[in-house]
UniProtKB/Swiss-Prot annotation:
The gene is PEX5. This is Peroxisomal targeting signal receptor. Gene3D superfamilies: Tetratricopeptide repeat domain (1.25.40.10). Interacts (via WxxxF/Y and LVxEF motifs) with PEX14; promoting translocation through the PEX13-PEX14 docking complex. The lineage of its organism: Eukaryota, Fungi, Dikarya, Ascomycota, Saccharomycotina. Receptor that mediates peroxisomal import of proteins containing a C-terminal PTS1-type tripeptide peroxisomal targeting signal (SKL-type). Binds to cargo proteins containing a PTS1 peroxisomal targeting signal in the cytosol, and translocates them into the peroxisome matrix by passing through the PEX13-PEX14 docking complex along with cargo proteins. PEX5 receptor is then retrotranslocated into the cytosol, leading to release of bound cargo in the peroxisome matrix, and reset for a subsequent peroxisome import cycle. TPR repeats lie at residues 64-97, 313-346, 347-380, 381-418, 419-456, 457-490, 491-524, 525-558.
Length: 612
């Protein structure tokens, strides 16, 4: 039922007419073999009759229904200004079955009856009293059309009368005042009366005034209307000085906002090297907002306090040897941490530290290290490429787009400059969206690839990343496979291919790609973690647990021939791995193992059951 049809300011005959038709149908059925349960909608197409209301017969008294019947049969009409339209409305709502096409009605005629009631809303919505209250009811018809369960915060009464019949289309309906206490009392009193004597009824006008007064007293509608009218008058009579004051406050707010924004932009320029925020990129202030958001939220690299390589002048060389010999990435990271502690401007140490941490499933530390590298060497291609990937992994897509732009400008300055000159219209526009930025950068990289005589696997990587950010995994897979045809022994690319296959719901193929990456680099922690996730997706939980335990074991390091602060390592950086392991044990119904999973746990507890 439309919310507007409940208003006392509109024609109260509408409610009486609906219920009188219901009672008339029931009386007709009583005369025909007493078939009280037969629906009046069966075999009829009368508008305005709803089977949904049959469950609530005698919603008003028999006395009022008889009077209403006299009116319908040709008794004197009330004034034309309050006349209701008996014919069907042309502005009828679409059938509920069209709104919720995935649900099937158990009784189509019942749903049709519910729909037929909606023709009353067109008359009631034309009333001035309702139009003056459109803040509460103006969107009620739209709410019905989209299957909303709430029409107005002021009219949220449960309509239990409708629920039993419209369940196939809507779970519940709100916005009806038919179940307010006043009407509930009328329903109960109406059931006790059997006969109707038309000659003993009061005049029609007295009945309507009585009904309207009763509803107004119980629901306080008149008070609400008066309050809203008073508020409207106050707003119309508001002095001009108040409006001027509001304008002054608005200007002050704008001034304060601009001051804060300029401060944020200045902070971004101080943190990043000038090459990353200068006007050469010409990407507009809106983009710098996205990039600045990442920069302003940047955290310093979190060093491990217990590090045996501190004060070792050969820490960088030791780290390189550990990586070349396939040692644990966590141990190599400690060596590089010691190297940058010893020499904070060591560009290669920061770069390798960032590469190690991103492969070691410690993304945030990797991002911090790579950003430090770019501060020292803004044109470091490897740092820019890896940082763009990490930004995408962490959801900083806009920052990744700018990093890819800077990477292409650095590696192919002449070609990239020519491409950007041909398409500088976009660069001068402001207010572009994430999708626009993606499409623009992708178009430029495609032009760059077409200008090269041979396939550059790094260009294919960048294109794959751009397609990845808009969930176009098929094109992402094509790009990564093209790169692997040029360099088939790139374990990082095999891992990226596996991630794309996994996101395409091709877990079996993803597992093969991860295995290939681990064959090329057994210490590749991220590939091992991704392998565990894909194993979970196909229900191989025991194998997944083994891979996750391997990841945790590879984060353990020995310091001074003693176990290091493994618990701190796990608790600080490997919460994701621990939580994933918990989910695996839950899926296996192994509460005994679940209780053992915590930071600093002894992995030997799991050796007997899992292979890692």
């Amino acid at each position: 039922m439309d919310v507007g049809s409940c208003s006392v300011g509109n024609n109260p005959l509408a409610q009486l007419h609906k219920h009188t038709q219901q009672n008339k149908s029931l009386q007709f059925n009583q005369k025909n073999n007493g078939r009280l349960n037969e629906s009046p909608l069966q075999g009829t197409n009368k508008p305005g009759i709803s089977e949904a209301f049959i469950s609530n017969v005698n919603a008003i008294s028999q006395e009022n229904m008889a009077n209403m019947q006299r009116f319908i049969n040709g008794e004197p009409l009330i004034d034309d200004k309050r006349r209701m339209e008996i014919g069907p409305s042309s502005g009828r709502l679409p059938p509920f079955s069209n709104v919720h096409s995935l649900q099937t009605s158990a009784n189509p005629t019942q749903i049709k009856g519910v729909n037929d009631i909606s023709h009353w809303s067109q008359e009631f919505q034309g009333s001035n009293s309702i139009q003056n209250r459109n803040a509460d009811t103006g969107n009620s018809e739209k709410a019905w059309q989209r299957g909303s369960t709430t029409a107005s915060s002021r009219f949220q009464y449960p309509n239990t009368m409708m629920n039993n019949y419209a369940y196939a289309s809507m779970n519940s309906l709100s916005g009806s005042r038919l179940q307010s206490p006043a009407f509930m009392n009328q329903q109960q009193s109406g059931r006790s009366k059997e006969g109707v004597n038309e000659q003993e009824q009061q005049p029609w006008t007295d009945q309507f005034e009585k009904l309207e007064k009763e509803v107004s007293e119980n629901l306080d509608i008149n008070d609400e209307i008066e309050k809203e009218e008073n508020v409207s008058e106050v707003e119309q009579n508001k002095p001009e000085t108040v409006e001027k004051e509001e304008g002054v406050y608005g200007d002050q707010y704008q001034s304060d906002f601009q001051e804060v924004w300029d401060s944020i932009h200045k902070d971004a320029e101080e943190v990043l090297p000038s090459e990353l925020v200068n006007d050469d990129l010409n990407l507009g202030e809106d983009y710098l907002k996205y990039l600045g958001g990442r920069v302003n939220g940047n955290i310093e690299y979190a060093f491990q306090s217990n590090n045996e390589y501190f004060n070792n002048p050969n820490a960088y060389k030791i780290g390189c040897l550990l990586m070349e010999n396939g040692a644990k990435l966590s141990e190599a990271a400690l060596a590089f941490e010691a190297a940058v502690k010893e020499k904070p401007d060591h560009v290669d140490a920061w770069l390798r530290l960032g590469l190690v941490q991103t492969q070691n499933e410690k993304e945030l530390n990797g991002i911090s290290a790579l950003e430090e590298c770019l501060k020292l060497d803004p044109k470091n291609l490897e740092a820019m490429k890896t940082l763009a990937i990490s930004y995408i992994n962490e959801g900083y897509d806009m920052s990744a787009f700018t990093m890819l732009d800077k990477w292409a400008e650095t590696k192919y300055p002449e070609i990239w400059s020519r491409i950007k000159q041909q398409d500088d219209k976009f660069q001068k526009e402001k207010g572009f969206t994430h999708i626009d930025m993606n499409a623009h950068i992708t178009k430029q990289f495609l032009q760059l690839a077409n200008n090269l005589s041979t396939i550059d696997p790094e260009i294919q990587l960048c294109l794959g990343l751009l397609f990845y950010t808009k969930d176009d995994f098929d094109k992402t897979i094509d790009c990564f496979e093209s790169a692997l045809r040029v360099n088939p022994n790139d374990e990082l690319m095999w891992n990226r291919l596996g991630a794309s296959l996994a996101n395409s719901n091709r877990s079996e193929e993803a597992i093969q790609a991860y295995h290939r990456a681990l064959q090329l680099k057994p210490s590749f922690v991220r590939a091992r973690y991704n392998l565990a996730v894909s194993s979970m997706n196909i229900g191989c939980f025991k194998e997944a647990a083994g891979y996750l335990l391997s990841v945790l074991s590879m984060h353990e390091v020995n310091t001074n021939n003693k176990k290091g602060d493994v618990g701190s390592l796990l608790n600080t950086y490997n919460d994701t791995v621990i939580e994933t392991l918990k989910r695996v044990f839950i899926a296996m119904n192994r509460d005994d193992l679940l209780q053992e999973v915590k930071p600093g746990m002894d992995l030997k507890r799991f050796k007997g059951e899992f292979s890692f």
